[in-house]
Protein backbone atom coordinates (compact mmCIF):
# COMPACT_ATOMS: atom_id res chain seq x y z
CA UNK A 1 0.00 0.00 0.00
CA UNK A 2 1.44 3.38 -0.98
CA UNK A 3 1.36 6.48 1.16
CA UNK A 4 -0.72 8.24 -1.49
CA UNK A 5 -3.60 5.86 -0.80
CA UNK A 6 -3.48 6.44 2.93
CA UNK A 7 -4.02 9.22 5.39
CA UNK A 8 -1.72 9.66 8.38
CA UNK A 9 -3.64 10.96 11.37
CA UNK A 10 -2.09 13.40 13.80
CA UNK A 11 -0.48 11.67 16.77
CA UNK A 12 -0.66 8.20 15.21
CA UNK A 13 2.06 6.08 13.65
CA UNK A 14 -0.25 3.95 11.51
CA UNK A 15 -1.30 4.80 8.00
CA UNK A 16 -5.05 4.58 7.56
CA UNK A 17 -7.10 4.46 4.39
CA UNK A 18 -9.61 7.19 3.69
CA UNK A 19 -12.45 4.83 4.62
CA UNK A 20 -10.74 4.08 7.94
CA UNK A 21 -10.35 7.80 8.55
CA UNK A 22 -14.07 8.24 7.89
CA UNK A 23 -14.84 5.53 10.46
CA UNK A 24 -12.70 7.37 13.02
CA UNK A 25 -14.55 10.58 12.19
CA UNK A 26 -17.80 8.87 13.18
CA UNK A 27 -19.37 8.70 9.72
CA UNK A 28 -20.31 5.03 10.22
CA UNK A 29 -21.65 5.41 13.74
CA UNK A 30 -20.20 5.74 17.20
CA UNK A 31 -19.97 2.00 17.87
CA UNK A 32 -17.80 1.28 14.83
CA UNK A 33 -15.79 4.40 15.61
CA UNK A 34 -15.01 3.14 19.13
CA UNK A 35 -14.04 -0.27 17.76
CA UNK A 36 -11.55 1.20 15.30
CA UNK A 37 -10.18 3.60 17.92
CA UNK A 38 -9.23 0.59 20.03
CA UNK A 39 -7.62 -1.23 17.09
CA UNK A 40 -5.64 1.85 16.06
CA UNK A 41 -4.41 2.32 19.63
CA UNK A 42 -3.25 -1.31 19.71
CA UNK A 43 -1.60 -0.98 16.32
CA UNK A 44 0.12 2.20 17.40
CA UNK A 45 1.43 0.50 20.54
CA UNK A 46 2.89 -2.35 18.47
CA UNK A 47 4.24 -0.11 15.69
CA UNK A 48 1.90 -1.64 13.13
CA UNK A 49 2.24 -0.11 9.68
CA UNK A 50 -1.42 -0.44 8.71
CA UNK A 51 -4.64 -2.38 9.16
CA UNK A 52 -5.32 -5.66 7.35
CA UNK A 53 -8.67 -7.35 6.60
CA UNK A 54 -9.88 -10.28 8.71
CA UNK A 55 -12.44 -12.80 7.50
CA UNK A 56 -13.77 -13.89 10.91
CA UNK A 57 -13.36 -13.32 14.64
CA UNK A 58 -14.06 -14.96 17.99
CA UNK A 59 -14.78 -12.82 21.05
CA UNK A 60 -14.05 -14.30 24.47
CA UNK A 61 -16.20 -11.85 26.40
CA UNK A 62 -18.13 -13.39 29.27
CA UNK A 63 -20.93 -12.50 31.66
CA UNK A 64 -18.86 -10.13 33.76
CA UNK A 65 -18.93 -6.37 34.17
CA UNK A 66 -15.68 -5.56 32.36
CA UNK A 67 -16.93 -7.36 29.27
CA UNK A 68 -20.39 -5.83 29.55
CA UNK A 69 -19.00 -2.30 29.29
CA UNK A 70 -17.36 -2.79 25.89
CA UNK A 71 -20.12 -4.94 24.39
CA UNK A 72 -22.74 -2.33 25.28
CA UNK A 73 -20.49 0.53 24.19
CA UNK A 74 -20.42 -0.89 20.66
CA UNK A 75 -24.00 -2.16 20.56
CA UNK A 76 -25.48 1.07 21.92
CA UNK A 77 -23.45 2.92 19.31
CA UNK A 78 -25.20 1.02 16.53
CA UNK A 79 -22.29 -1.22 15.54
CA UNK A 80 -22.80 -4.51 13.70
CA UNK A 81 -20.33 -7.32 13.11
CA UNK A 82 -18.93 -7.01 9.59
CA UNK A 83 -17.48 -10.55 9.54
CA UNK A 84 -18.66 -13.77 11.25
CA UNK A 85 -17.90 -13.32 14.95
CA UNK A 86 -18.56 -16.19 17.35
CA UNK A 87 -18.86 -15.87 21.12
CA UNK A 88 -17.36 -17.55 24.16
CA UNK A 89 -19.71 -19.13 26.72
CA UNK A 90 -21.43 -17.14 29.43
CA UNK A 91 -23.86 -19.43 31.27
CA UNK A 92 -27.31 -20.91 30.85
CA UNK A 93 -29.20 -18.52 33.13
CA UNK A 94 -32.61 -20.29 33.28
CA UNK A 95 -30.93 -23.65 33.91
CA UNK A 96 -28.72 -22.44 36.74
CA UNK A 97 -31.52 -20.42 38.33
CA UNK A 98 -33.47 -23.65 38.52
CA UNK A 99 -30.55 -25.54 40.10
CA UNK A 100 -29.14 -22.76 42.30
CA UNK A 101 -32.14 -20.59 43.12
CA UNK A 102 -30.10 -17.96 44.96
CA UNK A 103 -27.81 -16.73 42.17
CA UNK A 104 -27.48 -12.98 42.86
CA UNK A 105 -29.85 -11.06 40.58
CA UNK A 106 -27.19 -8.50 39.67
CA UNK A 107 -24.92 -11.29 38.38
CA UNK A 108 -27.68 -12.74 36.22
CA UNK A 109 -28.55 -9.27 34.93
CA UNK A 110 -24.96 -8.69 33.76
CA UNK A 111 -24.96 -12.00 31.88
CA UNK A 112 -28.33 -11.25 30.25
CA UNK A 113 -27.15 -7.83 29.11
CA UNK A 114 -23.91 -9.24 27.67
CA UNK A 115 -25.84 -11.81 25.65
CA UNK A 116 -28.34 -9.21 24.49
CA UNK A 117 -25.48 -6.94 23.44
CA UNK A 118 -23.98 -9.65 21.25
CA UNK A 119 -27.39 -10.34 19.76
CA UNK A 120 -27.74 -6.67 18.81
CA UNK A 121 -24.23 -6.70 17.33
CA UNK A 122 -25.21 -9.55 15.01
CA UNK A 123 -22.64 -11.98 16.42
CA UNK A 124 -22.89 -15.76 16.12
CA UNK A 125 -24.39 -16.74 19.49
CA UNK A 126 -22.34 -19.93 19.73
CA UNK A 127 -21.45 -19.56 23.44
CA UNK A 128 -18.59 -22.01 23.04
CA UNK A 129 -14.84 -21.88 23.66
CA UNK A 130 -14.16 -24.37 20.83
CA UNK A 131 -15.80 -22.52 17.89
CA UNK A 132 -13.20 -23.85 15.46
CA UNK A 133 -14.86 -27.29 15.66
CA UNK A 134 -18.28 -26.29 14.34
CA UNK A 135 -19.56 -22.74 14.44
CA UNK A 136 -16.64 -20.65 13.13
CA UNK A 137 -13.96 -22.66 11.34
CA UNK A 138 -10.99 -20.82 9.78
CA UNK A 139 -9.10 -22.23 6.81
CA UNK A 140 -5.35 -22.62 6.38
CA UNK A 141 -3.71 -19.25 5.76
CA UNK A 142 -6.83 -17.26 6.66
CA UNK A 143 -6.34 -13.98 8.55
CA UNK A 144 -8.59 -13.92 11.61
CA UNK A 145 -8.89 -12.33 15.07
CA UNK A 146 -9.49 -14.98 17.75
CA UNK A 147 -9.43 -14.46 21.48
CA UNK A 148 -9.81 -17.34 24.01
CA UNK A 149 -6.41 -18.56 25.17
CA UNK A 150 -7.00 -22.17 24.09
CA UNK A 151 -8.40 -21.20 20.68
CA UNK A 152 -5.53 -18.95 19.61
CA UNK A 153 -2.83 -21.68 19.52
CA UNK A 154 -5.24 -24.17 17.94
CA UNK A 155 -6.10 -21.76 15.13
CA UNK A 156 -2.46 -20.79 14.52
CA UNK A 157 -0.90 -24.21 14.88
CA UNK A 158 -3.39 -26.96 14.09
CA UNK A 159 -5.37 -25.12 11.41
CA UNK A 160 -2.61 -22.82 10.15
CA UNK A 161 -4.69 -19.65 10.07
CA UNK A 162 -3.19 -16.42 11.42
CA UNK A 163 -4.26 -14.62 14.56
CA UNK A 164 -2.69 -12.76 17.42
CA UNK A 165 -3.51 -13.55 21.02
CA UNK A 166 -6.45 -11.18 21.04
CA UNK A 167 -8.23 -9.78 24.05
CA UNK A 168 -11.99 -10.21 24.12
CA UNK A 169 -12.39 -6.53 23.28
CA UNK A 170 -9.86 -6.39 20.44
CA UNK A 171 -11.34 -9.51 18.83
CA UNK A 172 -14.84 -8.04 19.02
CA UNK A 173 -13.58 -4.74 17.60
CA UNK A 174 -11.97 -6.63 14.71
CA UNK A 175 -15.24 -8.44 14.08
CA UNK A 176 -17.09 -5.12 13.90
CA UNK A 177 -14.57 -3.31 11.68
CA UNK A 178 -13.47 -6.35 9.69
CA UNK A 179 -9.82 -5.44 10.20
CA UNK A 180 -6.94 -5.84 12.64
CA UNK A 181 -3.51 -4.18 12.94
CA UNK A 182 -0.65 -5.79 11.02
CA UNK A 183 1.71 -6.95 13.77
CA UNK A 184 2.74 -10.04 15.74
CA UNK A 185 1.73 -13.42 14.37
CA UNK A 186 0.31 -11.90 11.19
CA UNK A 187 3.95 -11.42 10.10
CA UNK A 188 5.81 -14.54 8.98
CA UNK A 189 9.10 -13.82 10.74
CA UNK A 190 7.25 -13.53 14.05
CA UNK A 191 5.87 -17.05 13.61
CA UNK A 192 9.23 -18.78 13.90
CA UNK A 193 9.90 -21.16 16.76
CA UNK A 194 11.70 -19.95 19.87
CA UNK A 195 12.28 -23.11 21.96
CA UNK A 196 13.12 -26.68 20.99
CA UNK A 197 11.20 -29.20 23.10
CA UNK A 198 12.48 -32.77 22.88
CA UNK A 199 9.71 -35.13 23.97
CA UNK A 200 10.54 -38.68 24.99
CA UNK A 201 7.67 -39.05 27.47
CA UNK A 202 4.99 -41.64 26.79
CA UNK A 203 1.87 -39.91 25.48
CA UNK A 204 -1.00 -42.38 25.78
CA UNK A 205 -4.09 -40.21 25.95
CA UNK A 206 -5.64 -36.75 26.28
CA UNK A 207 -4.53 -36.35 29.87
CA UNK A 208 -0.88 -36.91 28.94
CA UNK A 209 -1.24 -34.02 26.49
CA UNK A 210 -2.80 -32.02 29.31
CA UNK A 211 0.32 -32.61 31.40
CA UNK A 212 2.61 -31.95 28.44
CA UNK A 213 0.94 -28.61 27.75
CA UNK A 214 1.04 -27.63 31.40
CA UNK A 215 4.74 -28.48 31.71
CA UNK A 216 5.80 -26.85 28.44
CA UNK A 217 3.87 -23.67 29.20
CA UNK A 218 5.45 -23.41 32.63
CA UNK A 219 8.98 -23.94 31.32
CA UNK A 220 8.71 -21.51 28.41
CA UNK A 221 6.29 -18.88 29.65
CA UNK A 222 5.99 -16.81 26.51
CA UNK A 223 7.23 -18.24 23.22
CA UNK A 224 6.67 -20.60 20.31
CA UNK A 225 7.76 -24.16 21.18
CA UNK A 226 8.82 -26.63 18.50
CA UNK A 227 8.09 -30.14 19.78
CA UNK A 228 9.99 -33.15 18.43
CA UNK A 229 9.85 -36.84 19.31
CA UNK A 230 6.07 -37.18 18.99
CA UNK A 231 5.64 -40.04 16.54
CA UNK A 232 1.88 -40.67 16.60
CA UNK A 233 -0.37 -37.92 15.28
CA UNK A 234 -2.36 -36.40 18.18
CA UNK A 235 -6.13 -36.44 17.83
CA UNK A 236 -8.33 -33.36 18.07
CA UNK A 237 -8.99 -33.68 21.80
CA UNK A 238 -5.31 -34.19 22.60
CA UNK A 239 -4.41 -31.04 20.67
CA UNK A 240 -7.19 -29.04 22.33
CA UNK A 241 -5.90 -30.09 25.75
CA UNK A 242 -2.31 -29.21 24.88
CA UNK A 243 -3.38 -25.77 23.66
CA UNK A 244 -5.53 -25.05 26.70
CA UNK A 245 -3.14 -26.20 29.40
CA UNK A 246 -0.05 -24.55 27.91
CA UNK A 247 -1.94 -21.31 28.52
CA UNK A 248 -2.70 -22.10 32.16
CA UNK A 249 0.97 -22.15 33.12
CA UNK A 250 2.27 -20.01 30.24
CA UNK A 251 1.27 -17.89 27.25
CA UNK A 252 1.67 -20.04 24.15
CA UNK A 253 -0.07 -18.54 21.13
CA UNK A 254 1.50 -20.93 18.64
CA UNK A 255 3.53 -24.14 18.53
CA UNK A 256 4.93 -26.59 16.01
CA UNK A 257 5.04 -30.36 15.87
CA UNK A 258 7.01 -30.64 12.60
CA UNK A 259 5.48 -33.18 10.26
CA UNK A 260 2.30 -33.31 12.35
CA UNK A 261 1.06 -29.72 12.43
CA UNK A 262 0.41 -27.98 9.14
CA UNK A 263 2.78 -25.04 8.82
CA UNK A 264 6.25 -26.61 9.04
CA UNK A 265 7.30 -30.07 7.89
CA UNK A 266 10.79 -29.86 9.39
CA UNK A 267 12.43 -28.44 12.51
CA UNK A 268 14.53 -26.11 10.35
CA UNK A 269 11.42 -24.75 8.68
CA UNK A 270 9.75 -24.18 12.05
CA UNK A 271 12.73 -22.13 13.26
CA UNK A 272 13.03 -20.40 9.86
CA UNK A 273 16.67 -21.56 9.79
CA UNK A 274 17.39 -19.70 13.05
CA UNK A 275 18.63 -21.34 16.25
CA UNK A 276 16.41 -21.99 19.29
CA UNK A 277 16.75 -19.78 22.34
CA UNK A 278 16.72 -22.84 24.57
CA UNK A 279 16.21 -26.60 24.58
CA UNK A 280 13.88 -28.43 26.94
CA UNK A 281 13.58 -32.17 27.50
CA UNK A 282 10.31 -33.78 28.54
CA UNK A 283 10.49 -37.31 29.89
CA UNK A 284 8.00 -39.34 31.91
CA UNK A 285 9.64 -37.82 34.99
CA UNK A 286 8.65 -34.28 33.95
CA UNK A 287 5.06 -35.33 33.30
CA UNK A 288 4.93 -36.99 36.72
CA UNK A 289 6.28 -33.79 38.25
CA UNK A 290 3.54 -31.77 36.52
CA UNK A 291 0.91 -34.23 37.73
CA UNK A 292 2.12 -34.10 41.33
CA UNK A 293 2.14 -30.30 41.28
CA UNK A 294 -1.56 -30.26 40.38
CA UNK A 295 -2.64 -32.38 43.35
CA UNK A 296 -3.60 -30.59 46.55
CA UNK A 297 -6.00 -33.07 48.13
CA UNK A 298 -7.37 -36.59 48.24
CA UNK A 299 -10.31 -38.26 49.93
CA UNK A 300 -13.97 -37.21 49.91
CA UNK A 301 -15.25 -35.02 47.07
CA UNK A 302 -18.34 -32.82 46.70
CA UNK A 303 -18.41 -32.45 42.93
CA UNK A 304 -16.78 -33.30 39.60
CA UNK A 305 -16.53 -30.59 36.94
CA UNK A 306 -15.58 -31.49 33.35
CA UNK A 307 -15.54 -29.59 30.06
CA UNK A 308 -12.89 -26.90 30.25
CA UNK A 309 -12.47 -26.45 27.30
CA UNK A 310 -15.94 -27.58 26.22
CA UNK A 311 -16.17 -31.33 25.74
CA UNK A 312 -16.44 -32.69 22.21
CA UNK A 313 -18.88 -35.36 21.06
CA UNK A 314 -16.12 -37.96 21.40
CA UNK A 315 -15.49 -36.95 25.01
CA UNK A 316 -19.21 -37.08 25.83
CA UNK A 317 -19.25 -40.59 24.40
CA UNK A 318 -16.34 -41.51 26.69
CA UNK A 319 -18.14 -40.14 29.75
CA UNK A 320 -21.28 -42.09 28.84
CA UNK A 321 -19.26 -45.26 28.37
CA UNK A 322 -17.65 -44.91 31.79
CA UNK A 323 -20.97 -44.17 33.52
CA UNK A 324 -23.08 -46.81 31.79
CA UNK A 325 -24.76 -49.00 34.41
CA UNK A 326 -23.43 -46.87 37.29
CA UNK A 327 -24.77 -44.18 39.62
CA UNK A 328 -23.15 -41.01 40.91
CA UNK A 329 -22.75 -41.17 44.67
CA UNK A 330 -25.45 -39.35 46.62
CA UNK A 331 -24.14 -35.97 47.75
CA UNK A 332 -21.77 -35.66 44.76
CA UNK A 333 -22.74 -33.46 41.81
CA UNK A 334 -21.34 -34.32 38.39
CA UNK A 335 -21.19 -31.68 35.65
CA UNK A 336 -20.09 -31.74 32.01
CA UNK A 337 -19.88 -28.47 30.04
CA UNK A 338 -20.19 -28.64 26.26
CA UNK A 339 -21.37 -26.72 23.22
CA UNK A 340 -24.99 -26.72 22.07
CA UNK A 341 -23.90 -28.44 18.86
CA UNK A 342 -22.14 -31.29 20.67
CA UNK A 343 -25.04 -31.77 23.10
CA UNK A 344 -27.60 -32.09 20.29
CA UNK A 345 -25.54 -34.84 18.67
CA UNK A 346 -24.88 -36.49 22.04
CA UNK A 347 -28.62 -36.57 22.72
CA UNK A 348 -29.25 -38.24 19.37
CA UNK A 349 -26.60 -40.84 20.15
CA UNK A 350 -27.96 -41.55 23.63
CA UNK A 351 -24.93 -40.24 25.54
CA UNK A 352 -26.79 -37.48 27.39
CA UNK A 353 -29.45 -39.95 28.52
CA UNK A 354 -26.81 -42.25 30.00
CA UNK A 355 -25.00 -39.41 31.79
CA UNK A 356 -28.19 -37.92 33.20
CA UNK A 357 -29.53 -41.37 34.06
CA UNK A 358 -26.45 -41.89 36.21
CA UNK A 359 -27.13 -38.62 38.04
CA UNK A 360 -24.91 -36.30 36.03
CA UNK A 361 -25.70 -33.05 34.25
CA UNK A 362 -24.73 -31.95 30.73
CA UNK A 363 -24.88 -28.16 30.48
CA UNK A 364 -24.43 -25.94 27.41
CA UNK A 365 -23.45 -22.31 26.79
CA UNK A 366 -21.54 -22.22 30.08
CA UNK A 367 -17.98 -21.35 31.07
CA UNK A 368 -16.21 -22.61 34.18
CA UNK A 369 -15.12 -19.05 34.97
CA UNK A 370 -18.59 -17.65 35.70
CA UNK A 371 -20.53 -16.64 38.84
CA UNK A 372 -23.04 -19.48 38.36
CA UNK A 373 -20.63 -21.87 40.12
CA UNK A 374 -20.59 -19.87 43.36
CA UNK A 375 -22.16 -22.79 45.27
CA UNK A 376 -18.90 -24.76 44.93
CA UNK A 377 -16.70 -22.04 46.42
CA UNK A 378 -15.88 -23.81 49.69
CA UNK A 379 -16.26 -27.38 48.49
CA UNK A 380 -13.83 -30.06 47.37
CA UNK A 381 -13.84 -30.76 43.64
CA UNK A 382 -12.19 -32.94 41.04
CA UNK A 383 -11.61 -32.24 37.37
CA UNK A 384 -9.54 -33.47 34.45
CA UNK A 385 -8.57 -29.87 33.59
CA UNK A 386 -5.90 -27.75 35.30
CA UNK A 387 -7.56 -24.76 33.62
CA UNK A 388 -10.80 -25.56 35.43
CA UNK A 389 -8.97 -25.93 38.75
CA UNK A 390 -7.24 -22.59 38.19
CA UNK A 391 -10.43 -20.73 37.29
CA UNK A 392 -12.61 -22.15 40.04
CA UNK A 393 -9.97 -21.83 42.77
CA UNK A 394 -11.20 -25.01 44.44
CA UNK A 395 -10.87 -25.13 48.20
CA UNK A 396 -8.95 -28.32 47.52
CA UNK A 397 -8.23 -29.40 43.95
CA UNK A 398 -7.91 -32.88 42.58
CA UNK A 399 -6.88 -33.18 38.94
CA UNK A 400 -6.86 -36.55 37.21
CA UNK A 401 -7.77 -38.56 34.17
CA UNK A 402 -11.39 -38.74 33.10
CA UNK A 403 -11.74 -42.32 34.32
CA UNK A 404 -10.41 -41.26 37.73
CA UNK A 405 -12.95 -38.42 37.87
CA UNK A 406 -15.81 -40.79 37.07
CA UNK A 407 -14.57 -43.36 39.58
CA UNK A 408 -14.38 -40.69 42.30
CA UNK A 409 -17.90 -39.47 41.46
CA UNK A 410 -19.29 -43.00 41.79
CA UNK A 411 -17.42 -43.77 45.03
CA UNK A 412 -17.73 -40.29 46.53
CA UNK A 413 -14.02 -40.02 47.10
CA UNK A 414 -10.68 -40.23 45.41
CA UNK A 415 -8.52 -43.01 46.66
Language-model-derived ranges and their functions:
Residues 9-415:
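Non-transmembrane, aqueous-exposed alpha-helical and coiled segments at domain scale
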Residues 1-10:
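Intrinsic disorder/low-complexity segments
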